[in-house]
């Protein structure tokens, strides 16, 4: 793209506000494409495909599916697709900033379950193999992960991002990076 990026870390629930206010040009943080988000933002070609997984403590036998969340408590990032999915199954959701905090609440027994990207849980378990939780369900359909930018009649920036993503896919870089950081290829739906 010929630009030098400036990386800005922020809480999940403020990422889109920062994009809206022009503090960021894009958000690269595992953003799932949804109909609601597509009303406001233009998305690149997906660079990843993930499934939402449901995690519970290892000793939990009451929750084995998303349907079992009715009346249970979860912790998820505010405004995330995971929060929305948990609520759609009747869970009460506690807003949390990080996966680390969520897992601490789960393993301490302060929440019943949590939802997140399957690859995020796998990554956590690779670092913490003795963590006291298990995955009991995941969505059948993969979510598309892409980069949102503000909608504009001038699509040059979005086109440049799409070209870069396709070049990274074609030369195998996306596959290599996803295998390195997630232990599997999430760069294609296959």
Regions found by a protein language model. Name each.
Residues 6-18, 61, 78-80, 94-108, ...:
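Short helix-initiation/N-cap motifs at beta->coil->alpha
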Residues 25-26, 112-113, 146:
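Short, Asp-centered acidic motifs that coordinate Mg2+ and/or phosphate
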Residues 31-40, 85-88, 112-141:
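A ligand-binding cleft/hinge motif common to bilobed small-molecule-binding domains
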Residues 19-20, 69, 106-107, 147, ...:
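Hydrophobic residues within well-ordered alpha-helices
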Residues 57-73:
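Flexible hinge/capping segments at coil-to-helix
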Residues 81-96, 133-135, 156, 163-190:
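Ligand-binding clefts/hinges and TM-proximal coupling segments of bilobed small-molecule sensing domains
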Residues 49-56, 122-164, 184-190:
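Periplasmic-binding protein-like
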Residues 1-30, 171:
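Extracytoplasmic small-molecule ligand-binding "clamshell" domains
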